[in-house]
Structures are given as C-alpha cells and as structure tokens.
Amino acid sequence: MKKLFTIDDLMIGFIMAIGYGLGFAVPKAMGWSDWESGLVCWVVGYVLQEAATRILFSKTVQSNTAYRYTVFGAFVLLFLAAEYAVMSWMGLSASDYLLEQYLYIIGLPVLMFAFQMAVRWYRIRKIREQYGDGSHGFVFDDALKKIDLDEVNRQNQPITGAYDTDLAVKTKTGIYVGVKEKNIIYYSGIPYAKPPVGERRWKAPEPLPESEAVFEAKYLGASAIQVEHEGSILKHHRQSEDCLTLNICTGAKKTDQKKPVLVLFHHGDFAYGGSADPLLDGVELIRSCPDIVGVSFNYRLGLFGFIDFSQVPGGDAYPDALNLGLLDQIAALKWIKENIAAFGGDPDRITVMGFASGAISICLLAACEQAKGLFRKAFVFQGNPQAAYETPDVSRNLAKKLLQETSATTMEELMQLSTDRLKEVSQKILHDLYPTGPTRDGRLIPPDAFEAYRNGSADHVEFLIGVARNERQVYKSVVGKQTYEDFITNELDIALQFLDTVNATDAQAVRDYIRELAETMPEIEAKAKVVEQCSALSGYLTARKLAESGKKVYLMYWNVKPLIENLGSGTVDVAAAFLGNREGAQMYGNVLNSDISEMLRKFLIKFLRGDAMRFYNNEIKGVGAIDWKRFPKALVISDNGLQCEPIEDKLTEETCLLRFMEAI
C-alpha cells in the first residue's frame, strides 16, 4: 500500500514550513498588514512546495538513492543559509516558526486520510446493508433505481439538420456525433457491421458500406439477446439481434499525437453480458489518462453466436454459425483498425483486454489467422484457449435441443421464428446448463492454439495474463447457487473422465484430494476449490507456453481478500481496479481500494504505451520501487500491496492438479 508519509514528504514539509513561517513573519516584521503577509505566506509556501516536489519526486532523483540524499543535504544547507541570512538581516529565527508550521503541514494529510477512511467505512456499511452475507449473490436493485431506464434504452437517430462539428468524427461508414462531458467525449452505439437480422441471422458479419450520412452517437446500442441469471446486471437494458455496435471514449483535448487504444472484451460465459455493463465503464481511466482511447463492443451470444447447424436440413447454408461471436469480434477489430485514427487513436497500438469469456476470446483470436495483425498487446484475465471446445458436439446438441423446444425441423422453420421466441427458448436451454461457446473447429480456430502460437500466429503480440485466488464465488454470485453447483459438478466429472483415459493414477489422486478437502468443507465446495485451482493453473500454463514459444509475457496473481466472502474477489474486482471504476466496484459488492487501483492503472497505461513495466521510487507518491518482471515471475496483488515473485506454489496445494491441467 501507499505510505501516508515518506521521508521525501517529510523533507518537503520541512521546506514548506520554512516558507510559510518566514513568508508570514518577514513581511509582518516589515510592517505589512496581516492579509498582505498572509498572501505572501501562501505564495512563498506554494512556490517552495512545487519546486521541492518537482525536484525530489523527479525520476532522476528518485531512481538513485545517492541523488536523493544529496538533495536532502542540499535542502538542509539551504535552510541553514536562510536561517543565517534572516537572523543577520532582521533578527528573526526560522526555527521559531518551524515547529508550528511543520505540525500544521503534516497534520493536513493526516486529517485528509482520516476523512477518506470515514468515507470508506460509510461505503462498506452501505454495501453490507445491501448484501448482508452475500449468500443471495449480486443484487442490483438499488443501482437500477438510480438509472433512467427510458434514457438508457433510447436509440441513436440519423441527423438531417445542424450538428456540433466539434463533436463529429468522420469514419468510412458515416459521420458520428458524440457527447462531451467535462474533459471526455463519448461516442456510443456506433455500428461496426450490418445488422445480423432477417436473412443475415446466423450468418457471418458483413461490413458496412461507405457512407457520409450523419448519425447520433449518444446512446448505447442494444445488448445481444442473452440468458438472464439471478445476478445479471443487464436485465434492464434493451436486447436485440441488431447488437453489433461499439462505443468509444477519448479525451476532449485535440492533439496531433496518435493515442494507444484499449479495446474491452466483455465477460459472460458467451451467453450473457455486454458493453452496457457499468463495470466496464472506462471513463475514469480515460479521465486520469486522456491520451488513450477506450473502446467496448457487443457481439452475438448463446444460440445466436455459437451453434452448429450442420446436421439440420438446410444447415449447410450457415457454415459460420459455430463461431459467429468470434467472427463478430474480428469484424469489430477490423472496423477499429480502419477507423480509430479518426478518433485520435493509433491503429498500430491496439491492446485488447478481456475477462473470463472475453479473455478466452482473445486467446483464441491470437491463434486465428483472420485476426492476425489486428492487435499488438493482449491483457487476459481468467481465460485460456483450451477452454474452447475441441469438437462441435456441444454446439450440435444445442441445435438439436433448439429443434426439440421449437418443434422446428428445418433451417427454414428456424429462420421464421421471432426473436422473442428464440430468446424464450434460449433462456430455458442455456439456463438449464446447456453450455455454449466457441469451438476449435480447424477452420477459424486451429485445433491446438499453442501450436499456432509456436508457429507464429501471435508473433509481435505481448501478453499480460492474470489469474485469481477466489474467483469461484464471483461466478456463483452471478448465475445462482443451483447453476453454479451443476456447473462445478459437470466440469469436474468431464475432466476426470478424460484424465482417466490419459493418466488414471493422477485422476485418482485428484479424487483423493477432493475427499480430503471434503473432510473440512461441503463436498460441492471441495469440488469448487479444485475447479478454481485448475482455472488458475490453466492461466499459469498458458503464460508458460506462450513464454516458451518466445512471446513476451507478464503474469499477475490477484490475491485480494473479498469484502464479503460469499461474493468472492476476482474478475469484477480486477476490472474495477484497472479501470478505476469505483461505482462499478460498489455495484458488485466491494469498495475500490484506491491505492491498488492507482498502481494498477499506472501499470496498465505503461503496458499500453510500451513503457518499462516498473515504478521508480515514489513515481506514485508513497510507493516504493516495483519491477514487474516477465514470466516466470508474477506481480502478486494483495491487501498488503504489490510484489513480484514466483507463484506456482501459491496456485495449488497438490502437484497432481498441475499435471492434471497439463494433460487437458
């Protein structure tokens, strides 16, 4: 954590105390009035503070201990010289004013810190009142009361009359007029492909024609048709098959220098979620660093985005339905690559950032020939390419189930079904744990992503991979207890059945480990703990294999305790911390740790810019030097701060689980 005071702060306080004390006493001794002396006092103190801060906290001084203490010595000598000069000239002693002013200067930060702690305590109390012990999962009722749903669900319209040209951006597909708020401009609901409706349902996204038409970009586009769980935040937001839109946020100040671009991939098990999730609001990140451009977007989900019709009569006309969600993502990245320069972004410095299913998507796109060159850096948290299905069996079963539920027999009949009917069926099928997601089909996605990495698919892509200690409770809080328990049991059973065919000894060792854990906790939680450890290990192995194939890889381990144990601490907390999203964290039952968030935002900005991943001492005031070394070291983030160290032994208590994940 940041220190309230460092030796540098105390030295600056020392200099300011002299400035304030003599700044008031000298004019007063010269016969000036109190207000004139007070004005001089403030000016002298402020100037000395700024000068001392710029000198002491400069990279040159803070990067070298000898320089720091040389500057300290110089400041002391300056004080002695000032003492001698003022004593000789006016008979005043700087020492007479030092203690009183020094206590005042040091006391102000203490009072501010106490105020911040009081505010934090108040927020924690409100969250605990709302969530209790967290056993009911995420609850958004209070947050939704503050939202004007009619306003949120409005749609952008064409503009035929006058518009604010300062807020207008011309792209290849149209002119979009955004909204300015303080030092930020938003462009929301911009289409990046033709609407996948009518005859384009279950077809690959088609590029938009070139246009000079003018459109509003004030309102978020519709979310994809999706499953609504107990802890879904987007129940209030309109949903539509016409969902292929993106949002752009950038600083309002014009500059000729092209900015790095951050593209956010939302989470949601490929079945729910979207860019309207307040958690993914990157405004605070852009506000704190306006020289980057933020982008978020929607893509098709569930049976609209990941379904195999190859065994349905007429299904051969829909060969891309298996991985439509990924094709949408590629289409979005292509639009961004072609148009982001108009918004001040650098098309050659695009970083993609994803959580959970968003992270899985990025790992798959890194292995995909169609996505090659569309991004240069990748931040993935709780995701790996092996999470995609090896065969289309699951997606074929989804199509079979769809036919059963709708009594349809052909693609022609499926195409005639209304959106509402398909949503109703989707809710039933997928809510009953009928899984959905991408498939390593050999067409779009290679069967072995790691082999593709070794063969150069992700050359020139730099990776930042994150894993969490307590992610399982986050998932439970979203989908509910029953779905969570069914998922844990099914995932583990399938994995163990596979391991039986590969290494029966390790499979039995895993079962023994579960029984051992079940002696001190419910069996389902023992299984969940194993699944959670396997998830973290899969991220670790992804980092290892990328590093072995010559990629630059940074690893991160989130080990922060949850505010409410039953809500966990993982994806939602990491997203809020890196984006500086205090309100998003509160909605999901936590209070943003501003110290951790400030440090992680700084690291993220360094990653986007291509700067060295290290802090020199006091680069962030109160934070010592941190050097985030590449894999196999990892940046461990805990309540006690950040440190870089190996983490393999932290991810599991049983080495058989590592072999288990290597086999899978």
Residue spans for each PLM region:
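Juxtamembrane "helix-exit" motif on the non-cytosolic side of transmembrane helices
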Residues: 22-32, 55-58, 82-94
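Short glycine-enriched nucleophile-adjacent loop
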Residues: 359-371
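Non-catalytic accessory segments of hydrolases
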Residues: 113, 123-312, 316-323, 589-600, ...
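Mobile gating loops/cap/lid regions near enzyme active sites that modulate substrate access
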Residues: 534-664
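Alpha/beta-hydrolase active-site loop
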Residues: 318-341
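Alpha/beta-hydrolase fold nucleophile elbow
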Residues: 343-355
